[in-house]
Amino acid sequence: MGRRVAVFSTAALALLIAGGAWMSAHRFHPGYEVGEENERENGRPPVEGDYWAVRLAYGGDPQHLRFEPTWMLESARQDRAIAEAVPTGRRSYVRSAETALALDPDAFTLLGPMPLRGEGFGADSAAGRTNVIVSDPDDPAIAYLGSDGGGVWKTTNCCSAATTWTVKTDFPEIASMAIGDLTVDPQNHNVLYAGTGDLRYGSFSFGAAGILKSMDKGETWSVLGQDVFNPLYGPSTNGFPQYQSIGKVVVDPNDSDNVIVGTKTGVFFSYDAGGTWDGPCFTNAFSTSTTAQRQDMTGLLAVNRSGSTVLYAAVGTRGLPTPVQPDLANNGANGVYRANMPSSGCPAVADWTLLTNGFPAGTGSGAPNTSRGRLEIAVAPTNPLILYAMFTDVTTRGILGIYKTLDGGDTWASIGAPGSPGSQMWYDAGITVSPTDPNVFFVSTVDLFRSTNGGTSYTNMTDAYSGGPVHPDNHARAFVGGDPQKLLNGNDGGIYFVDNAISATGSGNANWIPLNDTLPTIEVYHGDITANFATAATSGVNAGFQDNGSATAVFNGTPAATSWNATNGGDGIVSRIEPVLGQRWYYSSQNGNLTVSTNGPNNPEASASGAWSGDVLSFVFPFDIYRYGALDVAGSGCTSAQGCTHLIAGSNRVWETTTGGVSGSGWAAKTGNVTKNNLILGGDNRSFINNIHYSVSDPTVAILATNDGNVQYVFGLGAAGAATAVNVTGSNAVLPNRPMLDATTDPLNPLIGYAAVGGFAQNTPSRPGHVFQVTCSAQCASFSWLDKTGNLPDIPANAIIANPNIPKQVFVGMDWGLYYTDDISVPTPVWQRFEGLPHVMVWSFTIDRGFTTLAAFTRSRGVWAWPLPVSQGGGADLAVTITPPDRVTPGLEMHYSITVTNNGSDAAVNVQLASPTPAGLTFGSNTGDCTTAFPCVLGTLAAGETRNVTTSACVSRTYTLPAPVPLTASVDSDTTDPVPGNNSASASAPLVLSVFADGFDCL
């Protein structure tokens, strides 16, 4: 018998009825705050650049972060050993009678964004970053793209606003969905290769997982070289571990068996179409010199010269170190190298020729420099002797120079360069030459530029930050059907098409069309869903996106993939929704900048930040709202008048407000520093809170996870003065001293908690594991930990949450997907991977008020929702609903009906129904299955049985507030209820004022 329940509002989204009015207000003016900042210019975000290294390689000593590639290979073997099954509830899901909608119980439902609208750039349709594009040489209607984390996508109806995309790489063998390059075999257009990993030096780039190969025009794929192209590689002496990635893949135009791959560690060769590999091979002698120079391959060409294949390899190490990749300053090998295609093995260094004639002095000399950074190369399809090369400038991060050769690279001449390329050319770069004219080429920068005269002058074809039609930060280009007018362009906002690429005089009359309407590839951090998401007639969602701000979506009916509407810019981080009234929608951007809309899912109109800017805090600053409180119960944090008003946030200490945080009001530091304060990298302190959550059942209790390995409980929240933080880390005697990425409590018992742990077990060999359970006595005066990792793969666990309907069912979001156990209580839980969700990084979870839905927020594959299963073990699942009157008129009697249904498999004994009369009204009578005043004793309800009660009340002629009139009801019994979330309900009725001449009430 469970009497402690939450009250869930069926009117929580009253504002949603207004529909489109939300979406028309506050259009953005283009600028860096629209969608993104000048985002990776300093090489540091997210989390100031080193979060990638820390979350993988920290093991208690910040000066010795450690990673070995073999660890990931072993993790992949562990992952393959997990049975590809689904949660018990997925196949025997019991849908309650109130579930009128149709979220798929057998798989997660994609919610989008598909696409993102209103972010402020002219095309008004965005997706996530596109790294590479290929147009099919045989059929211009077929095109492929590679996402930075969402896999390979294909269209067969390119290129119009009606273009549709289908992902082709959702299969269990792929452990990384980051695609660095795509290429079609020049001799067999049915064959494609995709290189995994992201070469662009981003702080949060994903590593490689092999070469993908398709032999049927991208319909199916196999994985090659998993043991060769490891996701990461070990650090240099006293350095950080760094990620491997495949930035270039080319096929010998004269022999399809020869495949050449450019990576962050050199060149690899296959002479059997990817079956086996030789490498890494080096174009120079500086890979093993006293001060080893990096061998990042940012350019790779296999050029057909009258039946002979000539290779060009561009070493283009960025040159500017980052906290993640400190040896990027070792760029002394940067330059263009040429060799003939070998017949086997690695070409000897002596077989490569460094091309220097006309390039800046010192190119490829082995001496690190502050000028020559990333290097891009391209060949003219109509003349194999004409090539272009573009150096970025290490110091300015712009273009150092563009060079052209007419003799296959023997001599180079400097030509002009675009005048305003931006200052992140280490990130936005690339050249593609026209298929018909060697003097026409396009250059990717923040914008896309065109030259029609061999580089003498350039035209800006996109003008993103001046109201242009295309998203900024361009990466990929592909001509369609060999037509120089028809160009596909990929950038941080997805993919775009223009059919007058040559004849347009500029961005103003270029016929750009976004092709993003079916491309859900945005990188998502944290988000939220509205109350009773799976059952409400109108529901909503919001989330924050890397590079693309924050956004919302509203569903009238069953939630499904749809377009979202941007609300604010920057790097969107955490978003939350007040669930009772649906008025306050919270958003945040990098480093703890919180904002709020107080009139639904509109653009924020007020700051909601506290005074934490001087604290040590995460780029991905966490905050949460307590959403489960019973309405109008003292201390619950939720009222019918104000909704839920308790919010919590984490820097290196805990902050809370009990007034909704509007205009920053009410935030107060509740604790001191809850970290170890010892994760210091150089001069940067990385000891901060990664995640913080209220307990499900008690708003006075919270649990938090820190980057430096702490888990702490916080007691005494919701009251004035300081709260009490209790460190339950236990000196890491059981809990590993690795990054704690998330923590949550048991839905019923707040003194039972769970921690999701990052890193790898090899860094804490005596304390392995990724999921741990803590059990506390009162106020955690004593506590004990248990390792619940079971058969989970040894990869970072990013998020953890338990099903409030079945508390033993726990979900974990990892780098390779979503895993679950149906029984966390056993000593060694059995975990399985949920195959109804793509195998991508799951960054965070949320469960709605009402316990109907689990939402998962993923990197580069959007937002997903799944109807939470209910208990399969019997019990009486009592559900109560209220049908309010169409209107309430002062001076007249009102009537509302209450329905109680037993959706469980067992009879409910001693059922009691309560419905307090709203203030200002006078109870009249009950009819139907109850004829007494409340509480009504309904007796025993058999499985499937329903009781109906109609209540009348008199509304005083002087009644004015609250309006609308709030109505609540709750039901209970002596029988265990496995789904307490539907034991209570609320609704509201609109107040319609009227004048009565008789002056009497309810006559």
Annotate the PLM regions:
Residues 10-20:
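Hydrophobic membrane-insertion alpha-helices, especially the h-region
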Residues 2, 369-372, 881:
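Short intrinsically disordered, low-complexity coil segments enriched in acidic
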Residues 12-13, 52, 483, 537, ...:
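Exposed boundary/loop context
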Residues 8-9, 23, 95, 213, ...:
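Intrinsically disordered, low-complexity segments enriched in Ser/Pro/Gly/Ala and basic residues
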Residues 1-11:
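N-terminal Sec-pathway targeting helices
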Residues 27-870:
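Beta-propeller blade termini and top-face loops
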Residues 19-28:
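Bacterial Sec-dependent signal peptides at the C-terminal "C-region" and cleavage site
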Residues 872-1002:
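Exported/extracytosolic protein signature
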